[in-house]
């Protein structure tokens, strides 16, 4: 029997989000974390069908739309990409909220979105831009040294912004859209060095995002973010910007409520600020998403790549 998966695609600052509206199997009525675990354990091929070629792309982030646990929440969502599952996704949440409005599910205002790492608060503004009040962000360790194969010693901060990041300012790389290959090679080597050295986030959390920062003539900073699976973020990265704000706050370089304009490697911009909280900060990220497609993915029984090209 042919499988059908309904999707709506959007992009946030150039970074695509694929919202899965229907077609996935039931994951039960647990929390988003529990449902994510069921999806990963029992139905992972649905993730690969949506995200991997020939129907998807390494760049894309998937977002499975779920009924929320709390009646006060507008939706639940499980994020995933070509390599696995994400706890939270800032650009993806912006895309999800914009798409929920397109579907007629929400109007401008404040909405709660359940994710595997907690409930985030998102505001859909009248101009259809979206502000996401993220989960607690904090710096776990400062100036951690790691030996990077082929590059030598590198120092960076380890911070949580919804995913684990290694943030580097002194890297000697040119952060520009025409230098992505070199940036990817360098960031991949950093991640390999962290893994070899056994350097992790809190409680052994895998540091699967590498973030490089540089000065920018028009904005506060420009960044390159390597995501899990070796794809880079076209957007400024919501969770990465949250992690950056946590480091700035810890160093006393950014006061609560002051807007930080973070540019991506391709020039798209998020506006970010934070409120102080016990154990860290609560960041708010504002950006815009645009709709790009509505489609039904078809998976024929005899298609050898129906569930994706899995390497």
From Swiss-Prot:
Protein's job: Catalyzes the epimerization of trans-4-hydroxy-L-proline (t4LHyp) to cis-4-hydroxy-D-proline (c4DHyp). Is likely involved in a degradation pathway that converts t4LHyp to alpha-ketoglutarate. Displays no proline racemase activity.
GO MF assignments: 4-hydroxyproline epimerase activity
InterPro entries: Pro_racemase_fam (IPR008794)
Residues noted as binding substrate in the record, renumbered to the chain: 90-91, 209, 233, 238-239
Gene3D superfamilies associated with the record: Diaminopimelate Epimerase, Chain A, domain 1
Official protein name in the record: 4-hydroxyproline 2-epimerase
Its EC number(s): 5.1.1.8
Family: Belongs to the proline racemase family.
Catalysed reaction, written as an equation: trans-4-hydroxy-L-proline = cis-4-hydroxy-D-proline
Organism, as annotated: Burkholderia ambifaria (strain ATCC BAA-244 / DSM 16087 / CCUG 44356 / LMG 19182 / AMMD) (Burkholderia cepacia (strain AMMD))
Active site, UniProt feature: 89, 237
Keywords: Isomerase
């Amino acid at each position: 029997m042919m499988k059908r998966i309904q999707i709506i695609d959007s992009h946030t600052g150039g970074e695509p989000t694929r919202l899965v509206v229907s077609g996935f199997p039931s994951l039960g009525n647990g929390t988003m974390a529990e449902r994510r675990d069921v999806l990963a354990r029992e139905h992972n091929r649905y993730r690969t069908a949506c995200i991997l070629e020939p129907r998807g792309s390494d760049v894309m982030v998937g977002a499975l739309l779920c009924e929320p646990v709390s009646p006060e929440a507008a939706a639940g969502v499980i994020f995933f990409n070509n390599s696995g599952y994400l706890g939270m996704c800032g650009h993806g949440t912006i895309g999800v909220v914009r798409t929920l409005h397109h579907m007629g599910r929400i109007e401008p205002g404040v909405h709660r979105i359940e994710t595997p790492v907690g409930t985030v608060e998102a505001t859909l503004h009248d101009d259809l831009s979206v502000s996401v009040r993220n989960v607690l962000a904090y710096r776990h360790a400062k100036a951690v040294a790691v030996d990077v194969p082929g590059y030598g010693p590198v120092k960076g901060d380890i911070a949580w912004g919804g995913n684990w990041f290694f943030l580097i300012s002194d890297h000697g790389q040119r952060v520009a859209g025409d230098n992505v290959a070199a940036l990817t090679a360098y960031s991949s080597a950093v991640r390999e060095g962290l893994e070899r050295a056994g350097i992790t986030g809190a409680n052994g959390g895998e540091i699967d995002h590498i973030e490089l920062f540089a000065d920018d003539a028009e904005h506060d900073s420009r960044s390159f973010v390597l995501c899990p699976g070796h794809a880079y973020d076209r957007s400024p990265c919501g969770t990465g910007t949250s992690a950056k704000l946590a480091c700035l706050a810890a160093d006393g370089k950014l006061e609560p409520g002051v807007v930080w304009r973070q540019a991506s490697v391709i020039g798209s911009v998020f506006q970010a600020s934070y409120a102080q909280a016990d154990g860290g900060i609560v960041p708010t990220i504002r950006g815009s998403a645009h709709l790009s497609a509505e489609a039904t993915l078809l998976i024929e029984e005899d298609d050898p790549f129906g569930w994706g090209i899995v390497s």
